[in-house]
């Protein structure tokens, strides 16, 4: 039986909530796999040490994981986070999935400049691909329930044709947060005005003005959905290869 684990890093748990919102479809998936680790869902064994200034949580991440779903970014200031993400990569035999914007491209955690209570020393966050090799990345804040189910189903069935775009997104990490749409498409006049980015944006940060996208930086949360949906975001790279 396929072993699946959900590893929670620095995130809001929104991606896991999106996964559990699938209800019957989630039950179908869980009926065909073995959920070996999911701290939030199953209350896995942890060792908690509390001191005057911090709370330390030691997680027992099992080995032999077939599909690891990693939610949240990595805190570079926390050696426990670093240990957990390295252990997850070592214990994942097949696919490691960056689930959601924080894991895939850094998301809103990249806006952090100083630490906050209750962990004031935690100030530096990066997407997990900056630390380990990521096989698949599913952007969104959070990803839609349907997209999570389809990705998991394809991974279980070994549908590499369906998974290929997610493997491609995983290669770009923080560059695929939506900034690449501005830099590689809009600024280079490659946009064809299809409006797919505006339709996909989860926070309505993109307006179509005279058939061209106008991105409101005050609303944008760097979720990467527009990058994943844009049909021309990789055109400049293809052109460079041809040249």
Curated annotation (Swiss-Prot):
Necessary cofactors: Ni(2+); iron-sulfur cluster; FAD
Subunit and interaction comment: Complex of alpha, beta and gamma subunits.
Enzyme class, broadest EC rank: oxidoreductase
Hydrolase among keywords: no
Pfam families recorded: Fer4_10, Oxidored_q6
Keywords: 4Fe-4S, Electron transport, Iron, Iron-sulfur, Metal-binding, Oxidoreductase, Repeat, Transport
Reactions catalysed: oxidized coenzyme F420-(gamma-L-Glu)(n) + H2 + H(+) = reduced coenzyme F420-(gamma-L-Glu)(n)
Enzyme Commission number(s) of this protein: 1.12.98.1
Role summary: Reduces the physiological low-potential two-electron acceptor coenzyme F420, and the artificial one-electron acceptor methylviologen.
Superkingdom of origin organism: Archaea
Family: Belongs to the FrhG family.
Domain 4Fe-4S ferredoxin-type stretches: 182-210, 211-241
GO molecular function: 4 iron, 4 sulfur cluster binding; coenzyme F420 hydrogenase activity; flavin adenine dinucleotide binding; nickel cation binding
Protein name: Coenzyme F420 hydrogenase subunit gamma
Entry binding sites for [4Fe-4S] cluster 1: 191, 194, 197, 230
């Amino acid at each position: 039986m396929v072993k699946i684990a959900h590893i929670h890093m620095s995130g809001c748990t929104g991606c896991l909530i999106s996964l559990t919102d699938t209800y019957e479809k989630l039950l179908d998936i869980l009926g065909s796999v073995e959920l070996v680790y999911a701290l939030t869902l199953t209350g896995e064994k942890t060792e908690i040490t509390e001191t005057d200034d911090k709370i330390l949580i030691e997680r027992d991440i099992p080995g032999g994981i077939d599909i690891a779903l990693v939610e949240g970014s990595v805190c570079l200031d926390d050696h426990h986070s670093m240990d957990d993400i390295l252990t997850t990569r070592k214990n994942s035999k097949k696919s490691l999935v960056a689930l959601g914007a924080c894991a895939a491209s850094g998301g809103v955690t990249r806006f952090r400049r100083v630490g906050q209570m209750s962990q004031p020393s935690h100030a530096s966050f990066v997407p997990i691909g900056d630390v380990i090799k990521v096989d698949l990345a599913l952007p969104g804040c959070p990803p839609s329930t349907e997209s999570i189910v389809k990705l998991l189903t394809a991974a279980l069935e070994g549908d590499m044709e369906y998974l290929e775009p997610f493997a491609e997104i995983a290669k770009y990490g923080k560059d695929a947060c939506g900034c690449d749409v501005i830099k590689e498409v809009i600024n280079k006049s490659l946009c064809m005005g299809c409006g797919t980015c505006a339709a996909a944006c989860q926070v309505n940060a993109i307006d179509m003005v005279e058939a061209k996208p106008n991105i409101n930086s005050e609303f944008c949360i760097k979720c990467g959905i527009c990058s994943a949906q844009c049909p021309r975001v990789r055109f400049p790279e293809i052109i460079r290869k041809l040249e």
